[in-house]
Amino acid sequence: MAEQLIPIQWKDDALVLLDQTVLPNEVVYESFKTAEGVWDAIQVMKVRGAPAIGVSAAYGVYLGVKEVAESSAEEFIAEVKKVCAYLATSRPTAVNLFWALERMESVAKENAHLSIAQLKDRLLEEAKEIHREDEEINRQIGEHALTLFHDGMGVLTHCNAGALATTKYGTATAPMYLAKEKGWDLKIYSDETRPRLQGSTLTALELQRAGIDVTVITDNMAAMVMSQGKIDAVIVGCDRVAANGDVANKIGTLGVSILAKYYNIPFYVAAPTPTIDLKTPTGKEIPIEERDASEVINRFGQYSAPKESKVYNPAFDVTPYENVTAIITEKGIVRAPFMENLKKLFQ
């Protein structure tokens, strides 16, 4: 079996990230020792996927304050807040980023009685705990999702909600890995996911390396394979779930959900509870990141449209809750009415 790709590691007091911008052609690991480096890695998508962004940001908080000189607890906590506010500007849509930063800030405040050295140690411990928790969350999501699958199923996924977007297993791909462990033969179809192609460069790569049957299709082929009866279920990840069950995920997810509804195919969303944002009432309030035009018209160093073309490049879209069959969390499977049942997860 091919060497395991590990998206996030903590080694020698540094955050080590797998550079996902050069996959699948190169496997490059890069070390980061500053908050500025982590911010850049998140922004240019060397690390991506809501859970992985959250974990990386948590380590980024520690890296941002570990060299702070001895000071009062009040001054140190102010510095933690400053670093958190800075890292929060890296990408606006993934709620895990803000969840992790709020958690790190809370830990600093709750331990204000400690020495500065002890506070720094406590922040690193918390970042490592967030890292460990993510792996267990993913496995639990996979176990719940697997109850909706059966041997021989055809499953469509979009973008990369895989092990490369988390710390292990992934969210949408977790049942695929667990099915492999059970000896099941799922047939996975992975949308390439324009414009950054995470479905082909990342999902296909990691599943293929794991020995899972995966077929790459272009985004505009999804309707065709559904119409041919090749798809029994769709499962995607998400960057944020609003209180009413609306789901923000990689651009193109909305279209896939509409097709699934038309062909009466279950549309599942794999969502760790930190991705569920009860403070955001509906998808209309979710900020949608817009990215550079070059991703659309100059993806591989050559222009595929006139240089002067107007380009609209939202990184995410919002799937309405009406199109969602179920939201799969580490705590269980949530079905409509989502407004009511999502709240129960936190009671």
Swiss-Prot record:
Pathway: Carbohydrate degradation. The active site is at 239 (proton donor). InterPro entries: Deoxyribose1P_isomerase_DrdI, IF-2B-related, IF-M1Pi, IF_2B-like_C, Initiation_fac_2B_a/b/d, M1Pi_N, NagB/RpiA_transferase-like. GO terms for molecular function: S-methyl-5-thioribose-1-phosphate isomerase activity. The record marks 159 as: Transition state stabilizer. Its EC number is 5.3.1.-. SUPFAM superfamilies: NagB/RpiA/CoA transferase-like. It comes from the Bacteria. Substrate binds at residues 48-50, 91, 198, 249-250. Pfam families: IF-2B. The keyword Isomerase applies. Keywords: Carbohydrate metabolism, Isomerase. GO terms for biological process: L-methionine salvage from methylthioadenosine; pentose catabolic process. It catalyses: 5-deoxy-alpha-D-ribose 1-phosphate = 5-deoxy-D-ribulose 1-phosphate. Gene3D superfamilies: translation initiation factor eif-2b, domain 1, Translation initiation factor eif-2b, domain 2. Belongs to the EIF-2B alpha/beta/delta subunits family. DrdI subfamily. Catalyzes the isomerization of 5-deoxy-alpha-D-ribose 1-phosphate to 5-deoxy-D-ribulose 1-phosphate, as part of a 5-deoxyribose salvage pathway that recycles this toxic radical SAM enzyme by-product to mainstream metabolites. This is 5-deoxyribose 1-phosphate isomerase. It comes from Bacillus mycoides (strain KBAB4) (Bacillus weihenstephanensis). The lineage of its organism: Bacteria, Bacillati, Bacillota, Bacilli, Bacillales.
